[in-house]
Every structure is written in C-alpha cells, then in structure tokens.
Amino acid sequence: MNVLFISSEVAPFSKTGGLGDVAGALPAALASLGHDVKVITPRYRDLRGAERLEPTGQSLLLRFPFGELSGPILSARVSERLEVLFLENAFLFGNRHGLYGDAGGAFADNHRRFAYLSVGALQAAQRLRFIPDIIHANDWQTGLVPVALRRGFQTGPLAHAKSVFTIHNLAYQGQFPKDVMGDLALPWDLFTAHDGLEFHDTVNFLKAGLVFSDALTTVSPTYAREIQTPEQGYGLDGLLRHRAHRLHGILNGVDTHEWNPEDDAFLPARYGLKDLSGKAVCKRELLARFGLEDGPAPVFGFVSRLAWQKGMDLLLEALPAALHADIRVVGVGSGEGPLEEGLLALQSRYPKQVGVHIGFDPGLSHLVEAGADFFLMPSRYEPCGLNQMYSLRYGTVPIVRATGGLVDTVEGGLDGNGILFEAFHKSALLAAIRRALALYADPSRLDEFRRRGMEKDFSWGASGRRYEALFHDLVAE
C-alpha cells in the first residue's frame, strides 16, 4: 500500500511530545512491512537535522481569502520505502521559534498554519505523483485533512484514498472563533453541531477529523474506552460513542533501537536481561550528575512535560512527606512555570535528596530511565504514555496511576512488573511509594519485577501490524 502520513511534528526533526515520537516510528514500522510511506510535516525554523533536507523541485501554491501562500517541498529520505517531506513557508513556519506557540501563548495564526499543512499535504502528494491508498492524519493540527479530502479533492487522483485520524490527546482540540470559516474559505454548511465543525459556537479542528474520517484510532485500548465517557470525553464523548464502531484503540510502540539498555550510547554501562550489573553503574552516574551522594537509598525518577495532565502537582504535594524516608528523587522536564518553580524549590529545600533539571536533555533522560530504581508517572489521564514502557525495558519499576495506556502496559500485583494506584490523591501516591520501598527491601523480588518488565515486547512491529490490518480492511471496503 501507499500510505501518506501527516503530522505537525516528526522525530527526530521536530518534537514537543509523544506525537513526534509516533510520527517518527510508526511510518518506519509500516515501511519495514513493505509499504511505501511518505510523511508530511512543516519545515519549522528550528528544525533539527535541517542539513539533511534536499529540494524536490516541486512547490505549493494555496489560495485563501487572506492571501496566496506558496513554498517549496523539501525531502529527507529515511529508507528505500520511507521519505519525510517538509512544507516550507517563511510567513507561517520560518519566521518564528516554536512549533505551536511561545511564552505569550499559542500563535494567533495557528488556524492558518495548520490549514496550510492539511491542504498543502494533499496538494504535495499530487505534485509528487504519490497516490496514497491511506491518508493518515494526526491530532487537531491535521483535522482539516479529511474535510479537504472530501470537499476539495473528491475528484482526481486522491478520490479513492481512505482516511484515518488518530487522537493522541483529546484534550487538545484546536478551537477557533467561527470567523475562521471565512478566513479559510470553509463552506458554511460545515458549521453545524451534528455532523460538522461547530462546537459551542467555535470551529473545532479535532472534531473535523472525528466527523469526516473513514476510521478513527487512538493510542491505547483503555483510552479508546475512556474518551467515550463524559469524564474524559471533553464534550466529544457523544460523537465518539456514535462513531464507536469506527474507533480502534491501538497501543503505541517504542523505538527499540533508541531505547535499548544493551546498546544505549548515553549510558556509562550497558546491561540486559542476562546481566543487570550495568544498572548499578548507571545509578551511580545518575546521582553524580545531579550532585547527590551515592548510597544504598532507592532512587525515584521522572522525565515529563511539567503539566497538569501529567499529575506533577500531585507529585509536588506528595514528595515532602515521601522524603521523610531515605530516598532520592531526580527528574527532567519543562513546562508550566509554577510546576518548574515548585520543583526547584523542592530541590532547594532537600538538596541532599532531590535533583531537578529544567529543560529537555535526551542523554539525561536516558540516564534517568536506566539509573533510577523506580519511575514516577502519576498522570491525571494518559492516552498511551511512553516513559513507562521505556522504564520497563530498562528494568526500572514504574509507579503509575491506573489510567489510559498505563493500564494497558503496566501490570500490578505480586507477580507484576510495576505498581499502580487508583485514586488521584496524595495518600494513594504515598501508599504506592511505600509499596515501592517494601519491594526495594526485598532484592530478589525486585529483580523479578525488573526482569518481567524487561521481557515485555513494546516494539513498533506489533503496533505496525495492527495498523496494517486496519488499513487493509479500509481499502477492501
């Protein structure tokens, strides 16, 4: 099959979170199964690996009521069957830092930026004579793709393509004032609540994807069920229940080449199931990197976007009580100012027990996964989550709240590979930490937990085959 994959970020070129990881890994998994895959994404100003980009000799010209937009299509060949294409436009992407916003908030023209991506990706496929069987859009930034496919490309070479829309996080919906309908030349008959883009008198890009796509997926089976409830449906649960027969929960995989303790260039010592001794070396190096003394105390780590969703406020609430025990806590992340400040204040208050790095540091993130004994993920909700799977691969026991993809990947109980807690409450998290301390006091049992986690297969191969089966079913309809 020919698969066109459209995403607002693609690792390693651009990334703010899990979407970038998926957009980098799933197309590669599909290509390895023998499919021809092209990924289309913006050419941002701060693109990593920009030196790899080559001109295709083709360019876009899109006409909107606010003006004409044009720009070249650039290419980075990843493998024989996988190519990443970049849509360049100085006015929308090249004139600013950041993907979606800056310190002042979301960019005011995001509706224009991602309309250009959505429509431009389809035009780019035509210009490059790539005729997809499947067009796979992701999150609100590409929600207009299936709309454009039905309303602007319903004749011609893309007419028979099937559309798939993946919800990576339902909370982010891309809502804009209704006057963007005119700004983007969207037909007003689409501004309806039942089967259109209208949502509480706004234009909702995510809803557009949910309504107009041939199939919907989300990133774990549990999350697919959760988003059909009023508690986690963010106002779209009724629509999702209506389209439940088209909704599939497919668990994300992880990049097993990048995240492999047996061959991780970021680690001072490698290790695996047959020999875990290198993990102790990583623990010593981790403590040294944070200026903490080596010793017998267990190390609890986290690598996270510092956000309400991730439960970092709950962690801040619980840690002072947890630090009465002889433990170490180290973390890497950035995000909401009050959470950053709270973690730095905690580090100042407990300088011998807490180490915090504010910012994105891939090497340090790998070292936390390898060197920590336990990994903290107290998420309010978690569509899939990746770090708990990294932790399991690295023999680091995850402590997670029982929600979303965390339920689908972490096994609790005496014969499990992790520790789960139900209630989003300080007492529940502290109880989970106490269970971790009891586990740490029993080295043979801790070793069993580690090994059970390391034996799990979270490769993209399994996820890729699930998507492949879905794509085949769609094409056969």
Swiss-Prot record:
<keyword id="KW-0328">Glycosyltransferase</keyword>
<dbReference type="GO" id="GO:0004373">
    <property type="term" value="F:alpha-1,4-glucan glucosyltransferase (UDP-glucose donor) activity"/>
</dbReference>
<dbReference type="GO" id="GO:0005978">
    <property type="term" value="P:glycogen biosynthetic process"/>
</dbReference>
<dbReference type="InterPro" id="IPR011835">
    <property type="entry name" value="GS/SS"/>
</dbReference>
<keyword id="KW-0808">Transferase</keyword>
<comment type="similarity">
    <text>Belongs to the glycosyltransferase 1 family. Bacterial/plant glycogen synthase subfamily.</text>
</comment>
<dbReference type="Pfam" id="PF00534">
    <property type="entry name" value="Glycos_transf_1"/>
</dbReference>
<dbReference type="GO" id="GO:0009011">
    <property type="term" value="F:alpha-1,4-glucan glucosyltransferase (ADP-glucose donor) activity"/>
</dbReference>
<protein>
    <recommendedName>
        <fullName>Glycogen synthase</fullName>
        <ecNumber>2.4.1.21</ecNumber>
    </recommendedName>
</protein>
<comment type="pathway">
    <text>Glycan biosynthesis; glycogen biosynthesis.</text>
</comment>
<dbReference type="Pfam" id="PF08323">
    <property type="entry name" value="Glyco_transf_5"/>
</dbReference>
<dbReference type="InterPro" id="IPR013534">
    <property type="entry name" value="Starch_synth_cat_dom"/>
</dbReference>
<dbReference type="InterPro" id="IPR001296">
    <property type="entry name" value="Glyco_trans_1"/>
</dbReference>
<comment type="function">
    <text>Synthesizes alpha-1,4-glucan chains using ADP-glucose.</text>
</comment>
<dbReference type="GO" id="GO:0005829">
    <property type="term" value="C:cytosol"/>
</dbReference>
<keyword id="KW-0320">Glycogen biosynthesis</keyword>
<feature type="binding site">
    <location>
        <position position="15"/>
    </location>
    <ligand>
        <name>ADP-alpha-D-glucose</name>
    </ligand>
</feature>
